[in-house]
Amino acid sequence: MSAEAGRFAPGPIERRKRLVERAAYVCLLLTTAALILPLLGILAYVVVKAWPVLSWSFLVENPKNYMTAGGIWAPLVGTFDVVVLSLAIAAPIGVLAGVYLSEYARENWLTRLVNLAVVNLAGVPSIVHALFGVGVFVLMAGFGRSIAAASCTLAIMTLPVIITSTTEALAAVPFAFREACWNLGASRWQTIRTIVLPNAISGILTGVILQVSRAAGETAPILFTGALFYVAVTDSGVASFFPYGLRDPFMALSYHLFTISTQVTGASDALAYGTAVVLIALVLTVNLVSIVFRVRLRSRRKW
């Protein structure tokens, strides 16, 4: 019996491998904890500081008494409007551009140059996009400081990532699917519409939805192109979800958080932390929605 046990006992090389494996596991676990625990600590701290003002009235009331009381209805509605409008502009243009670059454009120096420009534009700081929006949309296009100028600026800022995510999602679809469809007599567009896009939709939607959270959290582009310190809107109601005209300035959560934290005297810290909690909750909700979409759509794949 002891001979059998000795025969299958791990040797020094095997013991060393197991030791390295356990050490790697512990290191990865500690690294993950070092990333997650500070985030949870920050989130808990912000929620505790915001707790005195977190209520339904905080969401559905306008700021009052020179921004020292009330809620965040006007900034919340402004953020909703500008994000929806920017997404309505950027999503179709970005997806169509990604489809063209992936499925129609020939592989040459011009295509490589365009792809390189798209990748580089994704890393341009938001303040540069803000200055571009001022020059093009506020001044040249004549929109003025308005929700239209801010939405167009955010759309330009989010376009590169949407294009990139679309091209990568389309490239992930096996080329054999296209060949099989072509052999059955389908045209290029029929192949894209019925085979390629349905199999790439999870990656495309993930890229689009994640840009919603980015647009909702940006401050510089809207600060330069349309966000104001205070704009009164009608309190809660279905009609008040779109109180702004395209040429009207607006309030936004990110800029509202900045102003009450740095420019308003007499405002309690709870108001600023409450605004931060709502903004964080909005971003987390969008990210969770993108994860759910991706998981559910990928589960339908047959490959």
Which role fits each region the language model picked out?
Residues 101, 167, 171, 175, ...:
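C-terminal transmembrane helix and the adjacent membrane-cytosol boundary/short C-terminal tail
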